Structures are given as C-alpha cells and as structure tokens.
Amino acid sequence: MKCFLVSRIDMPGALDCASRMKTALERAGHTVVLDPDTASMLGGSGHSINKVSADMAVVIGGDGTILRTVQQLHEQIPIIGINHGEVGFLADLEPEEAGAFVRSLAPGFDVEERMRLSLWNEEDHLGDALNEGLIVTTRPAKMLRFSILVDGRLTEQFRSDGILVSTPTGSTAYAMSAGGPIVDPRIEGFLLVPLAPYLLSSRPHLISSSRRLEIRLESSKPAKLVIDGQNTVELGSAVSLVIQKAASPARFIDVHRNFFEKVDRKLRKL
C-alpha cells in the first residue's frame, strides 16, 4: 500500500517516531511518501498534502497536526494518528503502539467516518470543519448578539462573547472546555455552545444534521470565524452563516477502541 506520512516538526520525539515509522512501513513492503515539511527534516522529496494520492495517511503529532492534515487533503483518505501532542483525542495510537499497528496493517482495514461541518455565507463556502467553527468578535471584551434559526424558525436570541458550532467529534475539544456535553461521534448533529452568554438560560443545543441551521450575527461589531483553529475568515458585521453537513466526512482507520474508554483515559491526563 501507499502510505502518506505527516509529522509535527517542532518536536524531536515526533520526528524520531516518524523516522522509525518510515523504516517500519518500508520494511513491511509499503511505499512511503512524505509531506514537504516532514521531508525537509528527514530527507527526500515531499508531496503536497492537497495533491497527494495514497491509500492511507499516518499523522504523528497532536490534534492540531491531524486537523491541519484533514483541512488540507483534497480527497479524504483514511488517517491513523500517533499521539505526540498534549492530549490527542483524535490520535488512536500512542508511540509505543505504532510497531504493532504496522505489523497488523493490511489492505481492507476497517474505516470509521466522522461527520464534518460545512460553513456558508450566502453562496460563499467558507470552509469545512472536523471539530468546530468559532465565531468571536474582533474587538476584545465586546459581546455579540446572535439569532439562531432552525429550519427557518427563530429558536433563540442571546448575547455572548461568541458561539461555537461543533461536530460530535469536536465535542471533546473547545466545546467541552466551554461547558458543552461529550457527544457520541456516531451521532450526526450540530452542537451549539454559547461562550459566556449574558443570560444563564442560554444553554448548549444538539441539533440534528438533517435540519437547516442558521446563525445570524445581529451585532454592528465586526466578527471573525475560526475553523478548526487553523483558518480565520473575517466576517464583518450583520452576517448570516448556514451550517450544513459536509459532503465528505473525515476518515480514520478503525483500531476498534471504545470511544468512551478512550475519552476517560485522555481526560485523566489533563
């Protein structure tokens, strides 16, 4: 199989792991290609993430490295993450488990699909998110006013420092820190979490992905949208965002770890 290898490059331990993985995969008969940054550190030529064609990707780093890879892939190929970050909710393997994974790797591996969000401003596609889209003011310490519409009906209005719209996968990221629930990733829905709302009655909502979700920014203050902590879009003021289920989900190699046991283990590290 052809394996695409991406590594965090600002951490020597991650690069050491990447070098070992490259050797192990090649010894097992797989072809390994590197992204340009990893290739610049390990030697050899690199292949752009948004142009690569491969059977799978091995991503070594934390959640940020995995999110960045998913963002840049033109076609969503199956990913396995090896944790070299802080917590690594998206990484199913620890470094000491990488060798056993390579030995068991064979064509026909199981794949788990994770829903992504697609964010639109009228006809403009702003981007897709595996974890979340965050709307915040560009002016510190200023609140924004939001209207939430579900299937065209106004369901809530509130003022807050911002709002998160998260996937179930992203429920263990920023949304959890902001007081949102942990959501089973097999559920397909939009998790809305107000950030520091002015009224205590403004609570998180989990909305089916089959519904049309619209977030209207009613404030005159300019705001910005941050997608998966990677890309920032300046929204201006008085704009409307429509959130849909993205056409292509993220794909992860399924190593058959129980989601709730994994979350419990990761949370104990915090």
Swiss-Prot record:
NAD(+) binds at residues 63-64, 68, 131-132, 142, 159, 161, 172-177, 196, 230. InterPro entries: ATP-NAD_kinase_N, ATP-NAD_kinase_PpnK-typ_C, NAD/diacylglycerol_kinase_sf, NADK. One of its GO terms (biological process) is NADP biosynthetic process. This is NAD kinase. It comes from the Archaea. Its main location: cytoplasm. It is found in: Cytoplasm. Involved in the regulation of the intracellular balance of NAD and NADP, and is a key enzyme in the biosynthesis of NADP. Catalyzes specifically the phosphorylation on 2'-hydroxyl of the adenosine moiety of NAD to yield NADP. GO terms for molecular function: ATP binding; metal ion binding; NAD+ kinase activity. It catalyses: NAD(+) + ATP = ADP + NADP(+) + H(+). Its EC number is 2.7.1.23. Its cofactor is a divalent metal cation. PANTHER family: BIFUNCTIONAL NADP PHOSPHATASE_NAD KINASE, NAD KINASE. Keywords: ATP-binding, Cytoplasm, Kinase, NAD, NADP, Nucleotide-binding, Transferase. Belongs to the NAD kinase family. One of its GO terms (cellular component) is cytoplasm. The active site is at D63.
